[in-house]
């Protein structure tokens, strides 16, 4: 990796659950071994990650291959310069915010992002793209979050993930495979703390497909990520794990709200303040 001038990843897995039968301790060893390489690539190189559409991805999205290819190229070729401009007010608001409050069915979570900054993503390193992220103060997270989007991590598919936090740490975790999810969170001490908070707003991505490059950008979504923090918004958390788990807050998924310092930022997947409305799907397409 240190000999690379740039890193371009074109990925198209044919079996997202290929590692589902590998013991958790082996996967943890793999993650710990790979993490220094990933950290160098993310922090020290010029890089971009994209997919190549195939039948497996179409199946995950519940589409025919032809329909998925049309969707894929529509998403990947949208006007990212327009997105970059539209997200600037959200970057400013997030960078200045202190207290964040997430509300929704089964979710009541508070944390601080004070002093950790915010980063906008509009096609520079991910294609597709569409998010603004920050990071919680490590020990500020308290409450419960109930995710409503399936997630594949370390080869295992998880559904109905529910995490309870006390002073930043996951003190209770349940899911469709509760044993496996806790084994992942026991990879290292940092895996039970949070390394990223992000709001997603790509207007073309509406439904989950168990591919996080797409799912974390879903319009009206957020992701609250356990494990390793990014250097751009660094709360000091270190882990071999970086698990983006997605909560969709549009009405058909139960709705929900995002508050910054007692100001309503988004309700039921729609941005509320006037300066953020250009990020709503009907305006951003």
Question: Which residue stretches match the model-derived regions?
Answer:
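Internal helix-turn-beta structural module
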Residues: 210-284
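Charge-rich, low-complexity intrinsically disordered segments
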Residues: 144, 151-157, 162, 268-285
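Long, well-ordered mid-to-C-terminal structural blocks that present hydrophobic/aromatic surfaces
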Residues: 138-183
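Active-site bordering "gate/hinge" segments
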Residues: 1-142, 279-285
């Amino acid at each position: 990796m240190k000999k690379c001038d740039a890193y371009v990843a074109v990925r198209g897995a044919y079996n997202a659950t290929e590692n589902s039968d590998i013991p958790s301790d082996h996967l943890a060893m793999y993650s710990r071994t790979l993490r220094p390489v990933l950290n160098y690539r993310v922090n020290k190189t010029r890089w971009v990650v994209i997919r190549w559409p195939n039948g497996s991805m179409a199946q995950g999205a519940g589409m025919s291959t032809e329909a998925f290819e049309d969707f894929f190229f529509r998403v990947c070729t949208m006007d990212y310069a327009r997105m970059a401009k539209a997200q600037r007010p959200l970057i400013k608001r997030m960078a200045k915010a202190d207290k964040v409050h997430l509300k929704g069915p089964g979710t009541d979570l508070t944390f601080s992002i004070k002093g950790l900054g915010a980063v906008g993503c509009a096609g520079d390193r991910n294609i597709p793209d569409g998010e603004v992220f920050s990071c919680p103060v490590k020990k500020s997270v308290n409450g419960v979050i109930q995710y409503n989007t399936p997630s594949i991590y370390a080869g295992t598919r998880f559904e109905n993930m529910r995490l309870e936090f006390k002073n930043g740490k996951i003190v209770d975790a349940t899911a469709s495979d509760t044993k496996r999810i806790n084994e992942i969170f026991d990879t290292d001490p940092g895996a039970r703390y949070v390394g990223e908070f992000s709001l997603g707003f790509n207007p073309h991505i509406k439904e989950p497909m168990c591919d996080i490059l797409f799912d974390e950008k879903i319009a009206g979504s957020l992701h609250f990520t356990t494990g390793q923090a990014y250097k751009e918004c660094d709360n000091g958390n270190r882990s071999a794990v970086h698990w983006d788990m997605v909560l969709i807050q549009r009405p058909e998924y139960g709705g929900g709200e995002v508050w910054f310092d007692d100001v309503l930022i988004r309700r039921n997947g729609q941005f509320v303040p006037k300066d953020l409305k250009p990020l709503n799907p009907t305006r951003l397409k």
